[in-house]
UniProtKB/Swiss-Prot annotation:
Keyword Aminoacyl-tRNA synthetase attributed: yes
Taxonomy of the source species: Bacteria, Pseudomonadati, Chlamydiota, Chlamydiia, Chlamydiales
Protein name, per record: Valine--tRNA ligase
Localization (cell): Cytoplasm
Motif ('HIGH' region): 47-57
One GO process term, biological-process aspect: valyl-tRNA aminoacylation
Length: 939
């Protein structure tokens, strides 16, 4: 074969760019909203424009592209909409850091418009990199429909949705205790707060009762908030304090008199049984304050410093204020003690700041009216969640859903479309262009709300905005909405998935997608090195790479699977992996790992393993090309003579049909790992290691007729075309490259359609590309009765020969001489002999009536068929040992099955077919044991 036409090694770099350009140039990614084909649509979870793609992006987009390519080949009008997310807090934070590092300036050094120009510039650069990387991965998105969560269409949709909810009274504005990030100076939703267990202190502080010499002691983790105390609470059932309920105490430093109240929410066993109530800075205290109509005093500035309500502590940070207050309490004799105490602390998922419960006026979405529909979509299976274990998580979250804080004190994002009157409480919600008519007439009296919407508000509308809503006449909306499936990580089931269901169903009264597949989160291997003091640090750089490649770990280094993190040194860059192993190897690795668990352990050796498979695919195809190069498409159009098909041919066709059936089932439930494994095993084991090895003597002219050889070649071409189709959704680059080589080799398809064996391959060859070819279908032939059983016997005969070779330590390169004894299955043995020779490394196999008396041989029995391997004289002792082992195994098996069959409970309750199978198994084992005993006796 010409090296230029078909190089010995596959080079991803030399083909991937050209193949992708061919697809894109040919318009194969573009969806047609006017098509009569059934629709299949996906909207890409938009990557944040904060940087570049990470391995999680590579995973989710590989899985989506696999589905899109599969459905495209099945004849659906597929539409995969790509896009990026403005990611309000995240992007603003990144840009602020960039400006600080590059220009030495803060956000507040710019006007709002100037700062936003910097953010838009950042967005353009980041988005271009992200989209380029998606192309490298092989994503077959419809780039003509590319969207951004702050593009004009998205902005129209966001304003429209806000006004719809505002007019319904679902959106409201009010004072509420929010999660405040003092670094980013914005409110966060409850699910944007991460909780960490942290060690701290429990402080005991005394408050003097007014007009009394008595004191009441409380325990608190946050003594600085006493400046905002408005009550002391005790349990009404706590006899220690019942006489004090209704009395008042004095708050130190601010000299405010506050009541002692009785409240059943107080845990009398915690601390002293008395707790301070600071409604403006604690969520539980807020509820108590509302129930008792207590004042709510905010003591903090937006930056986390003590405000004017803090008296002498005004201007201090929370941390410094705490220290000064404790010192001052000690001086006044009001500090009792402190105890070590561990508590859950809320931390901002973006800035890492300790979250401050903060009384603030914010915009909210009331969720009560949505709760039933959110449950109903999933309970009725209008939305199916995969894996189903997450249904419970979803429903639990919906049941505990609280009003959603949607305002953010940021500059980057969708500005809230509400105008406030400067002179009264009037507000106008407006969803049109420009501003409301009242504002245009008297602009000096109005101002637009300065806050922006939570990123998840616009992301919640993503499936709608991608297809043109709120334009109800949009062809895309009519054709492609609702979408088929949402593929995303399980970690944003609450952040995003539920909010999409809420927002989209509120706008158009239907679910945004039919299915949700929640993949696991990627974990990488990190290495902790411990020093003599027991302290540890993460290993990085060359040493880590050596460990990843299998270098033995020292005793003081421990490997651990952890979420990918730069600080842990276990980040795996998908683009680096593509450069090193090729996009197909990366995609296959990710698919093979995408099980239905919550964690995906991603190891470097997997990329190496699947790169080897890509090379195996190339080399296997190259071998086949060497034997079909003289074929033309016309040969395939003529079909094959099924009378010339052998057992091995029927076997491989049956295995292929079974593969299609299994893979289709796994696509339906998003078992990507099983799809990858099945396709991998079929090509590597069934096609290459089994079928090709069996037919090599025919291909090389060592056995069978010219007509049989021609039939095998047609079948090989047919199988290769079809398996390329099966593999294409996962490994599109190499399959497209090989498909184009097949088209060039076999030539233009004429008018013939082929037969039931070659017909679909002929149909695929008519396609411009593998990507748009029809997905393979089962190959229909008259399969012989008992095919699987017959080939199974052939495989077991081969296994027996290989087992004898191994146990006798015979040279694996030395062809063996074997014989077979079977009075009942001579025809089957005749069919099995070529398979035994090809796969068992046997030179000759004779059918005998009895074992040769003048030879030393090792004997095995398969389904009553005795198979023997002639041995050199020196192997007599080894054969006796082998037979004794086999005798022991069979005796144990016979004893176990006999006991089972002796059980009346088993015989009466078990399926009759299972009982019969056990009887047959017992009979075969007894026959095999007798053969072993006879052989031992002869030795």
């Amino acid at each position: 074969m010409n090296e230029d036409q078909f190089p010995k090694a596959y080079d991803p770099k030399s083909s991937e760019t050209g193949v992708y350009s061919f697809w894109e140039r040919s318009g194969m990614f573009v969806a047609n909203a006017s098509s009569e084909k059934p629709a299949y649509s996906i909207v890409m979870p938009p990557p944040n424009v904060t940087g570049i793609l990470h391995m999680g992006h590579a995973l989710v987009n590989t899985l989506q592209d696999t589905l899109i390519r599969y459905k495209r080949m099945q004849g659906f009008e597929v539409c995969w909409v790509p896009g990026t997310d403005h990611a309000g807090i995240a992007t603003q934070t990144v840009v602020e850091r960039h400006l600080k590092a590059s220009l030495g300036k803060q956000r507040t050094d710019f006007s709002r418009e100037e700062f936003l120009k910097h953010v838009w510039d950042w967005k353009e650069k980041s988005q271009n990199v992200i989209l380029s990387q998606l192309r490298q991965l092989g994503c077959s998105c419809d780039w003509s429909r590319q969207r951004f969560t702050m593009d004009p269409g998205a902005n129209r949709a966001v304003k429209k949705a806000f006004k719809i909810l505002f007019d319904k009274g679902v959106i409201y504005r009010g004072y509420y205790l929010v999660n405040w990030d003092p670094i980013l100076q914005t409110a966060l939703a409850d699910d944007e707060v991460e909780y960490e267990e942290r060690d701290g202190w429990l402080y005991y502080i005394r408050y003097q009762v007014v007009n009394s010499e008595e004191f009441i002691t409380v325990a608190t983790t946050r003594p600085e908030t006493l400046l905002g105390d408005t009550a002391i609470a005790v349990s009404p059932e706590d006899l220690r304090y019942s006489h004090l309920i209704g009395a008042k105490v004095v708050v130190p430093f601010v000299n405010r008199e506050i009541p002692i109240i009785g409240d059943f929410s107080v845990d009398a066993s915690f601390g002293t049984g008395a707790v301070k109530i600071t409604p403006a800075h604690d969520k539980d205290d807020y509820k108590t304050g509302m129930n008792h109509q207590l004042p709510m005093i905010n003591i903090l500035t937006p930056t986390g410093e003590i405000n004017e309500n803090g008296g002498i502590f005004t201007g201090l940070s929370r941390e410094v204020a705490r220290e000064n207050i404790i010192t001052s309490l000690e001086a006044l004799g009001l500090f009792v003690k402190k105890e070590a105490y561990s508590s859950r602390v809320g931390v901002s998922y973006r800035s890492g700041a300790i979250i401050e419960p903060y009384l603030s006026k914010q915009w909210f979405v009331s969720v009560d009216s949505f709760r039933d529909s959110l449950r109903g979509f999933v309970n009725s299976e209008e939305i199916r969640i995969f894996p189903p274990e997450f249904v419970r998580n979803y429903l639990t979250w919906v049941n505990n859903l609280k009003d959603w804080c949607i305002s953010r004190q940021l500059w980057w994002g969708h500005r809230i479309p509400v105008w406030h009157n400067k002179h009264d409480e009037n507000v106008i919600c407006f969803d049109g262009e420009g501003g409301p008519e009242e504002v245009m007439r008297d602009p000096e009296s109005w101002y637009q709300d300065p806050d922006v919407l939570d990123t998840w508000f616009s992301s919640g509308l993503w499936p709608l905005t991608c297809f043109g809503w709120p334009d109800e006449n949009s062809l895309d909306l009519k054709k492609f909405y609702p979408t088929a499936v949402l593929v995303t990580g399980h970690d944003i089931l609450f952040f995003w998935v539920t909010r999409m269901v809420l927002m989209c169903s509120a706008m158009v009264d239907t679910e945004p997608f039919s299915d949700v597949f929640l993949h696991g989160l990627i974990f990488g291997k990190s290495y902790r090195e411990y020093d003599e003091k027991g302290e540890w640090f993460y290993v990085s750089g060359e040493r880590k790479r050596d460990y990843d490649k299998g270098k033995a770990l020292p005793k003081n280094v421990v490997a651990k699977w952890e979420k990918l993190s730069k600080s842990k040194g276990n980040v795996i860059d998908p683009i680096e992996m593509i450069e090193a192993y090729g996009a197909d190897a990366v995609r296959l690795t990710l698919c093979s790992c995408a099980n239905r668990g919550e964690q995906i352990d991603l190891d470097y050796h997997l990329f190496e393993e699947y790169k080897n498979f890509i090379n195996k695919l190339w080399n296997g195809a190259r071998f086949i090309f060497g034997h079909i190069s003289e074929l033309t498409s016309r040969d395939l159009e003529e079909g094959v003579n099924q009378d010339l098909l052998g057992l091995e041919d029927f076997y491989i066709l049956d295995r292929f049909n079974e593969l299609l059936d299994l893979i289709d089932g796994h696509y339906n439930c998003y078992s990507f790992d099983k799809i990858a494994s099945l396709a991998y095993d079929f090509f590597k084991n069934d096609l290459c290691s089994t079928y090709l090895e069996i037919i090599k003597p025919t291909l090389f002219g060592k056995q069978d007729s010219d007509q049989q050889r021609a039939t095998k070649r047609k079948l090989l071409a047919t199988l290769l075309i079809n398996i390329l189709g099966v593999l294409h959704p996962i490994v599109p680059y190499i399959t497209e490259t090989l498909f184009q080589k097949l088209k060039a080799t076999l030539g233009t398809v004429e008018n013939g359609k082929g037969d039931s064996v070659t017909g679909h391959a002929v149909s695929m060859l008519r396609s411009e590309a593998c990507m748009v070819a029809e997905y393979p279908k089962p190959i229909h032939v008259a399969f012989p009765q008992g095919l699987r059983e017959s080939f199974g016997i052939a495989e077991r005969l081969v296994y027996t020969i290989r087992n004898i070779r191994g146990e006798m330590q015979l040279d694996p390169r030395e062809p063996l001489q074997a014989f077979v004894i079977s009075s009942e299955k001579k025809e089957l043995v005749d069919v099995c002999i070529p398979i035994m020779c090809a796969l068992g490394g046997v030179k000759t196999v004779e059918q005998l009536a009895e074992a040769p008396k003048d030879s030393i041989f090792s004997l095995g029995v398969v389904e009553g068929i005795q198979v023997g391997v002639i041995l050199p004289p020196e192997h007599l002792a080894k054969e006796r040992v082998r037979l004794e082992k086999e005798k022991t195994r069979l005796e144990k098996s016979i004893d176990s099955v006999s006991k089972l069959l002796a059980s009346e409970d088993f015989r009466t309750r078990a399926n009759p077919s299972l009982v019969q199978a056990k009887k047959d198994s017992l009979r075969n084992s007894q026959r095999e044991l007798q053969s072993i005993l006879d052989k031992l006796a002869s030795l």
